[in-house]
Design a protein with these regions (language model features):
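Surface-exposed amphipathic alpha-helical segments in non-transmembrane regions
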Residues: 120-122, 128, 166-171, 208, ...
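Short, charged interaction patches at domain edges and termini
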Residues: 199-216, 231, 240
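A carboxyl-terminal module marker
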Residues: 164, 168-170, 178-193, 233-240
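Short amphipathic alpha-helices in soluble, non-transmembrane regions
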Residues: 158-164, 213-221
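Conserved RecA-like helicase motor-core motifs
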Residues: 9-21, 173-183, 232-234
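Nucleotide-binding motor/catalytic cores of P-loop/tubulin-like NTPases across gene-expression machines
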Residues: 170-179, 193-197, 209, 222
Length: 241
């Protein structure tokens, strides 16, 4: 759709497109064409932002820049800031004046504002303050306990049972000192994968021996319970995605 709009707006301009539909070998060829033949417009996904250094690029635009802020991951702000600063940094690299235009529904968001200014210190202060408030790493550890199975109702009921078990276990003195908190269950961001539904609980606590042993016991106990036949339970620590 964006390519169609660009061709209507700039019918005489050459446009190159680089995204997942172009082959890996084609990426290099596209970039060489963009640089060598001075094709004025390069349209692409996030891959365009990373590691490209063209001195004649003077204008960069980012569409829906804040979408990645609202994914269910504690690193969302950091990743969005990193991506936007890379994009903004593509313009004006050869001594020419550069300009970046960022489309956003939340122009007052600290991440967007700091990225537009390339203000790393201000972003760090804002992000570290938010992580401390929410008990995100590095101030605590996040363990995602996911239950999966083919019947959504059973999966949800099992996840509720896992939550209650976790809350009981976290009352033990060796765990309570870390002020653990159990959240959920909630559907995974992509709730159904390969015909299996996924619901998960989140344990906020410390990555210490007592916690690891408790989670290992939980996995074994879940697996041997006949009520959980056909379902799986797995644990991620500070999950990247």
């Amino acid at each position: 759709k964006v390519e169609e709009e660009l061709r209507e707006l700039f019918p005489e301009a050459g446009i190159l497109r680089m995204d997942a539909d172009t082959t890996a070998g084609g990426h290099e060829e596209i970039l060489q064409t963009f640089e060598r033949e001075r094709v004025p417009i390069l349209l692409g996904t996030q891959m365009v932002a990373k590691g490209l250094d063209f001195e004649n690029v003077t204008l960069v635009g980012v569409l829906s820049a804040d979408i990645s802020l609202y994914v269910d991951n504690y690193r969302a702000a950091e990743r969005t800031f990193s991506l936007l600063t890379q994009v903004v940094g593509r313009a004006g690299r050869g001594g020419k004046t550069g300009r970046a235009v960022i489309q956003t529904y939340t122009p007052g968001n600290d991440v967007i504002r700091c990225a537009a200014r390339q203000d790393y210190d201000a972003f760090y202060e804002s992000e570290i303050r938010m992580r401390r408030l929410r008990r995100y790493p590095p101030f605590a550890d996040l363990f995602t306990v996911t239950v999966s199975g083919t019947e959504e109702g059973r999966v949800l009921r099992a996840a509720v049972s896992v939550r209650e078990t976790l809350r009981q276990l976290c009352r033990r003195p060796e765990l309570a000192a870390g002020e653990p908190e159990v959240l959920g269950p909630a559907p995974a961001p992509v709730v159904k994968v390969n015909n299996r539904f996924r619901y998960r609980c989140t344990l906020v606590g410390k990555n210490d021996k007592a916690t690891r042993e408790m989670l290992a016991w939980l996995q074994k106990d879940f697996a041997k319970d006949s009520a959980n036949r056909g379902m799986n339970l797995f644990v991620d620590h500070n999950a990247a995605d």
